[in-house]
Swiss-Prot record:
Family: Belongs to the plant rapid alkalinization factor (RALF) family.
Naturally occurring in which organism (per UniProt): Arabidopsis thaliana
Cell compartments where the protein resides: Secreted
GO BP, sorted A to Z: calcium-mediated signaling; cell-cell signaling; regulation of growth
Disulphide linkage map: 46-54, 66-72
Name listed for the protein in its UniProt record: Protein RALF-like 9
Length: 75
């Protein structure tokens, strides 16, 4: 029931590699840095000299809801 020496060596090396990978610090941050926020804050054709081109359009413009007297939702 004894394992051969080569299998023991392979398992030992695999364990060392696994522990080395598990001990490394992951470089992912849990917060957004200021340069990342600044890069994503401008429109595609935004020009610093002409700031009016930097204004974004409203995604969902306001529309009044349906009034009860109009019966636009089935009653």
């Amino acid at each position: 029931m004894g394992m051969s020496k080569s299998i023991k060596v392979i398992l030992s090396l695999a364990l060392v590699v696994f522990l080395a990978l598990a001990a490394t610090k992951v470089e992912a941050t849990r917060y957004i840095t200021y340069p990342a926020i600044d890069r994503g804050d401008h429109a595609v054709h935004c020009d610093k000299a002409h700031p009016n081109t930097c204004k974004k359009k409203e995604a969902n413009p306001y529309q009044r809801g349906c009034e009860k007297i109009n019966r636009c939702r089935g009653g």
